[in-house]
């Protein structure tokens, strides 16, 4: 049976940590765990997901929940409550539902204080990992029989009805998703006609019916070239010489968004070396299986710009294609021949590798994310197959695996801190410290231990890095990459805990460390008042014309986001209240400019575009919360009024809200099919309205939403998993498995607090 291990570094000599592995979560298969009742529950969960896989794509993340609840012998002792049609919502009903949710969720806390949860969903995370381990000869060492079985399960369970695989679990079939997962199945041992429900042959049919693998997008062409399934001449240039350009040039990699920089850094190294894996009999078979014409007859030059229409989200401007053609036809032929291959190309490769090693060391070989992790790991192996750099990478591979009832997948890199700070705020809002003091103390400890204590090593500015001391990451401290919203939410939590008795929640964070966090936020704010995610924004917008991907938007440079801005405004408003003497004028200016940015980017219909959640309900929750913290009200701010009107306009008949993920790529509000409600969206909208003072104007919409949340609670106190709720870069969805538990509890807590409910009946909601 699979078991989740917490804060465990194991005995691998090539792994190291900055904080005793607080926040680390790894899955291991325990052959001794053979309890028949537990095994039966796991198998039942798998079958239930399989039979409903076309109706509900995200899993309920049940395996670790079963493990934790069993280990803690949790039993829900608070009776379930329902509010019948025509029945009045009572204080007692809200309190009972809230207590049930809080006690259940407290039992799901890990021993180090964080809340584990899946953070996955893209269908292109696992295949490159399998390809890399196959190439390097470590596939059998890392992927045990149990790993293979669960990985194949995930691929089978998320195959679409037409035989293909999507860009993400909710998406329509794409060439990128289908080719990568097809190759993954074959590398893991499936034959050409193998796989559950004829998965392999159905996948191959989809590929061939849609033009074959030569129409895969550019990232796919790169991986196929690495595997020997395409020729490098079929790829647009990715010259490592970009790293030799003067840093003052607008297109220098140091001015890129960090994820773009970190993806194309190892890609350019592998491209510059034209690295291709050893051609095995299986590779020769795959060449015959995924192309519509014989491999040696493909005109690779003609397929460089070809992209399957199912994959195309961001068509390349003509200017970009002309740039690639120029590099392809003139520059690359010179740089790959003597003497320039010795004078320039080799120097560029060495500098690129220097940056790779620097980034690896400063993230403890987790790297910034899974796409980058695999490419950097492969680059280290290409440089030295027996070197310590590669061995350190192997030691951190388990940090990316996650197992649930739908199988094993690769995570983005983990959302431990993000989920924990939201969880802590939800529990704090419940005002139940007398019942869950130990839980709060452990969460406080985890958050304090997860703060980044130092800047990147050495002369970090020469490596195009920025200050990180005082920040928080998305996952754990070892990851090392500062994030503005994670820093703001971590700061807010520490400030809230500082208001409580230390004998209950532990000692408050020292002021100096709070000041470090404030310094990060002040450093990152843009001239327009907005907050970027990772690094200061300000590079030229026209650089987005050079976006080399076909399936993402706004990835070339850093941008500002309403969510990051709101989180920072809320944190600094609370900080100013508790520490009024520290950099007061700068903090006040930040709050004023941040609020103005939130107002300025509101859409004409009153909505705000959510960049990291689905989508306009998510954006509205953050925007209204940030404006309220800055002193903006329904009466004195037109943006608040428009935002409230937007939310009330899209409230559904059952009192909830439900938004399709299509809102994200379409950039316009799209409701769920059949006007279904989603409890996470409902929670976001409810909290946004509460921030705006809706309880004082007309509480009925709030009562209707609360009734839906109460009546949707499950027998054990949890809430059901519904549609996917996370997103990044407009077009790729992320499954935040903890959201279904966190936000309904948080919303009910805020509802109870804002509505001043009495023990008597408070409302008669509409049916």
UniProtKB/Swiss-Prot annotation:
Catalytic reactions on record: (S)-2,3-epoxysqualene = glutinol
Disulfide pairs? Answer: none
- Per UniProt, what is one GO molecular function of this protein? beta-amyrin synthase activity
Biological process terms in GO annotation: triterpenoid biosynthetic process
Its top-level enzyme class, in one word, is isomerase
Q: In which tissues is it expressed?
A: Expressed only in the epidermal cells on both sides of the leaf and not in internal leaf tissues.
Protein name, please?
Answer: Glutinol synthase
Q: Which organism is it from?
A: Kalanchoe daigremontiana
């Amino acid at each position: 049976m699979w078991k989740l291990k917490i804060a465990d570094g194991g005995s691998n000599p090539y792994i190291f940590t900055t904080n005793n592995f607080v926040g680390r979560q790894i899955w291991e298969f325990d052959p001794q765990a053979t309890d028949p009742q537990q095994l039966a529950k796991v198998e039942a969960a798998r079958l239930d997901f399989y039979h409903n896989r076309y109706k509900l794509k995200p899993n309920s993340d049940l395996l670790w929940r079963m493990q934790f609840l069993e280990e803690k012998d949790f039993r829900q002792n608070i009776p379930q409550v329902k509010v019948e049609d025509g029945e009045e919502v009572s204080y007692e009903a809200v309190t009972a539902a809230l207590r049930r949710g809080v006690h259940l969720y407290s039992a799901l806390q890990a021993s180090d204080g964080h809340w584990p949860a899946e953070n996955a969903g893209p269908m292109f995370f696992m295949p490159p990992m399998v390809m890399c381990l196959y190439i390097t000869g470590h596939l059998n060492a890392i992927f045990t029989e149990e790993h293979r079985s669960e990985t194949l399960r995930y691929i089978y369970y998320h195959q679409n009805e037409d035989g293909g695989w999507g860009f993400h679990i909710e998406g329509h079939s794409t060439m990128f998703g289908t080719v990568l997962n097809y190759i993954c199945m074959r590398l893991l041992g499936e034959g050409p006609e193998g796989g559950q429900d004829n998965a392999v042959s159905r996948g191959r049919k989809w590929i061939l019916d849609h033009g074959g693998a030569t129409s895969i997008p550019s990232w796919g062409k790169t991986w196929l070239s690495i595997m020997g399934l395409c020729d490098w001449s079929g790829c647009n240039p990715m010259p490592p010489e970009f790293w030799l350009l003067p840093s003052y040039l607008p297109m220098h990699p140091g001015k890129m968004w960090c994820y773009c920089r970190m993806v194309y850094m190892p890609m350019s190294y592998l491209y510059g070396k034209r690295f291709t894996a050893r051609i095995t009999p299986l590779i020769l078979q795959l060449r015959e299986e995924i192309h519509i014409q014989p491999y040696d007859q493909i005109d690779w030059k003609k397929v460089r710009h070809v992209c399957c229409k199912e994959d195309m989200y961001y068509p390349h401007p003509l200017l970009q294609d002309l740039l690639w053609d120029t590099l392809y036809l003139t520059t690359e032929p010179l740089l790959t021949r003597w003497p320039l291959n010795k004078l320039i190309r080799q120097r560029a490769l060495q500098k690129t590798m220097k940056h790779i090693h620097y980034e690896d060391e400063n993230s403890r070989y987790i790297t910034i994310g899974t796409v980058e992790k695999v490419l950097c790991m492969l680059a280290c192996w290409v440089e030295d197959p027996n070197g310590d750099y590669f061995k350190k990478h192997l030691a951190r591979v388990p940090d990316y695996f996650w197992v649930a009832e739908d199988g094993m997948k690769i995570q983005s890199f983990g959302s431990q801190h993000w989920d924990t700070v939201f969880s802590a705020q939800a529990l704090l809002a419940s005002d139940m410290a007398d019942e869950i003091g130990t839980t709060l103390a452990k969460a406080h400890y985890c958050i304090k231990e997860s703060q980044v204590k130092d800047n990147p090593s050495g002369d970090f500015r020469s490596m195009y890095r920025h200050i990180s001391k005082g920040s928080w990451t998305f996952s754990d401290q070892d990851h090392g990459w500062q994030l503005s919203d994670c820093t703001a939410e971590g700061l807010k939590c520490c400030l809230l805990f500082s208001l409580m008795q230390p004998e209950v929640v532990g000692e408050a964070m020292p002021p100096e460390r709070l000041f470090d966090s404030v310094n990060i936020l002040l450093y990152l704010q843009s001239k327009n008042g907005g907050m970027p995610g990772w690094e200061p924004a300000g590079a030229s917008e026209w650089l987005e014309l050079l976006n080399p991907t076909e399936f993402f938007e706004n990835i070339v440079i850093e941008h500002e986001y309403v969510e990051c801005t709101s989180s920072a405004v809320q944190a600094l408003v609370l900080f100013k209240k508790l520490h009024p003497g520290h950099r007061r004028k700068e903090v006040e200016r930040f709050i004023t400019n941040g609020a103005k940015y939130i107002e300025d980017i509101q859409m004409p219909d009153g909505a705000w575009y959510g960049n990291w959640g689905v989508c306009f309900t998510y954006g509205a929750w953050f925007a209204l919360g940030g404006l309220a913290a800055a002193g903006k009200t329904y009466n004195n701010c037109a943006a608040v009024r428009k935002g409230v009107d937007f939310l009330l306009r899209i409230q559904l008949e059952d009192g909830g809200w439900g938004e399709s993920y299509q809102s994200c790529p379409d950039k316009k509000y799209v409701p769920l099919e059949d006007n279904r409600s989603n409890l996470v969206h409902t929670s976001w909208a409810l909290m946004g309205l509460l921030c705006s003072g809706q309880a004082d104007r007309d509480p009925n919409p709030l009562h209707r939403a609360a009734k839906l949340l109460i009546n949707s609670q499950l027998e054990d106190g949890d809430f059901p998993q519904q549609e996917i709720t996370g997103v990044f870069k407009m077009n790729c969805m992320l499954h935040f498995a903890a959201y279904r538990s966190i936000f309904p509890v948080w919303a009910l807590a805020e509802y109870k607090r804002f509505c001043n409910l009495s023990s008597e009946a408070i409302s008669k909601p509409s049916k």
